[in-house]
Structure formats: C-alpha cells, structure tokens
Amino acid sequence: MKAYKLLTTASIGALMLGMSTAAYSDNWRYAHEEYEGDVQDVFAQAFKGYVEDNSDHTVQVYRFGELGESDDIMEQTQNGILQFVNQSPGFTGSLIPSAQIFFIPYLMPTDMDTVLEFFDESKAINEMFPKLYAEHGLELLKMYPEGEMVVTADEPITSPEDFDNKKIRTMTNPLLAETYKAFGATPTPLPWGEVYGGLQTGIIDGQENPIFWIESGGLYEVSPNLTFTSHGWFTTAMMANQDFYEGLSEEDQQLVQDAADAAYDHTIEHIKGLSEESLEKIKAASDEVTVTRLNDEQIQAFKERAPQVEEKFIEMTGEQGQELLDQFKADLKAVQSESEG
C-alpha cells in the first residue's frame, strides 16, 4: 500500500510538472476507473481516437490505479490537474447526492434496448443532470450504461433471507448502502483495490458489479456464486473540468462534444453481447462458478423492499431529488410505452 501511495504521488507530481509549462495545453489528460479493455477504457480510447484524428490535440488516458482511486481522479479533475474524468455516480453520489438515483433498486428496466433508448431520450439524463454537475464545476458530456449489476457471494443468493449476516461490499455511496440494508445484508464500504483481497480473506462475503468487471477483475475466483437479481444497471458519466471546457474555443468545444458522441456510439455497440461473452469466459475459466437467475417470484421478494430505498433517496436529496425522480419515472414510462406500442 505504501508503494502504491508513493507511485500515485509520483504520478500526480509528473502531471503537475507538465502543467507548469502549459496549463490546459493541447495535451489533454483523461482518467477513468477501469482496466485496459474494459468499458470505460473503450469509451476513453474512442474519445482519444476521434480527437486525435480530427485535430492537432492529443489525449493521454490514465487507467485505474495510475492516479489513485475514483475519489482521487475526481479531485484532480475539479482542481484542473485532469481535463476529463469518467466516474460512476456510485462515487459521485457523495459529491452530488441526486446522482444516487441510479441505485434505487428495480427503478431501471432490464431490457437493454429499453435502457439504451432511455439514455438517448431521457430529459432527466440529458437536461437535468448537466445542471447538477455544473454546480460542482463539472461539464457533463455523456452518461451511459455499462451493464446489468450482478451479485457475487460465498454462496448462491435466491432470497433476501440469504443476505442475512452477509457483508456485501459497496462503493462509498449512502444510497447503495441503504439498498443492501433493505435487502437484509450488512453493507461494507471498501475501495475497489481492496475488494479481491477482502473476498479472499473473508473480510467481505460478496459484492456487486457488471459481469464484464467480475470477469476482468477475476472476482469469480474468490466469489464464485453469481446471481442475476435484475435490480439495476451500472451507470457511468464522462465529464470535463468546467473551467477548462469553457476556456476552449467554440471549435474545440464542438470537437469535444463530437468526440463524446462518437465514443458513446462506439461504446454502446461494444456492450451489446458483452455480458454473455464475459459469462462464457468465466464459465470456461472455472468449474466452481454457479450462476443463478432469479425468477419472477424471487425478484418480487426483493422488489417489495425497494420503496424504503426510494424514501431514503428523497430524505437525502429533498425537493431536488423528488423532481429528478418524478422526471426519471416519466421518461421511463414514455420509453416503455414506445417499446410496447
């Protein structure tokens, strides 16, 4: 851990040295929360490629751990050390409480086409969220889904009772903790870098993540029982330091917007079929893995506990959260009506 901290400090020092000669130069810095080849990295590389193909600017991409944990890269973006950051609302929720809306269980549909249409058309996503991020010096460029959340644990989960006395790792997100309390578990916040070891040593009994992240992080090796609960999607957001963005020329602002749009389209194509592909890799790599998909009756037992989480969300966020939730539900209803029609 000490060596990791030293490496992180050295990395940040190198960034600061580069900035001392040309703040906000045409070498833009972009950090995200995942490993090489994971969804956020796919987005970042597509963004980088578009920018470099259509301008003289360059983009340096930093992956998980190179500049610290999620909280670190957000702080560096707000301070102007980084120009761009990709961070899940799971971590942003401590900064922007209303962003925790994605952690209300069973709010989102499970059908991918409906989810993608929602992200494209939602007023809450495309009009309300940018204003919330702007209050914290952040220019929200894109929100996008990465995949359905899957629970892994030391034994199969089929009911809320199976969560009794289970220590489930959560991000540093108050509403996610409330979700697992409602499900009957003991939420246990833990930095991502400590999750594998925590599962291996029994400090925690389980965790949740999209299946591709479970595969790439090797979590199935130490937490082999996978449960598809249908309770939510892992959502993330790509944003810029607002001072940096507003200081760009109109041409460069358009370049950034176009690059984000192109990266979004590329990433959405990438995630189609990714869950199935990742699950097949996991099954091929381990004979100990079990896969449980809850049926409608089992899902209903969890759904019945969701309203108390929604109430907590309103307690945490007040009138602003209520307005966002109302719009969120209206947007979802509109999209679902279109798909049914």
From Swiss-Prot:
The keyword Signal applies. It holds the Pfam family DctP. Disruption phenotype: Deletion abolishes accumulation of ectoine from the medium. GO terms for cellular component: periplasmic space. It is found in: Periplasm. One of its GO terms (biological process) is transmembrane transport. Residues 1-25 form the signal peptide. L-ectoine binds at E34, R169, N209, W213, F234. Keywords: Periplasm, Signal, Transport. It comes from the Bacteria. Part of the tripartite ATP-independent periplasmic (TRAP) transport system TeaABC involved in the uptake of ectoine and hydroxyectoine in response to osmotic upshock. Probably functions as a recovery system for synthesized ectoine that leaks out of the cell. Binds ectoine with high affinity. Affinity for hydroxyectoine is approximately 20-fold lower. PANTHER family: C4-DICARBOXYLATE-BINDING PROTEIN DCTB (PTHR33376:SF7), PTHR33376. Monomer. The complex comprises the extracytoplasmic solute receptor protein TeaA, and the two transmembrane proteins TeaB and TeaC. The ectoine/TeaA complex displays a closed conformation. Interaction with the transmembrane proteins induces opening of TeaA, which facilitates substrate release. NCBIfam families: TRAP_S1. Belongs to the bacterial solute-binding protein 7 family. This is Ectoine-binding periplasmic protein TeaA. It comes from Halomonas elongata (strain ATCC 33173 / DSM 2581 / NBRC 15536 / NCIMB 2198 / 1H9).
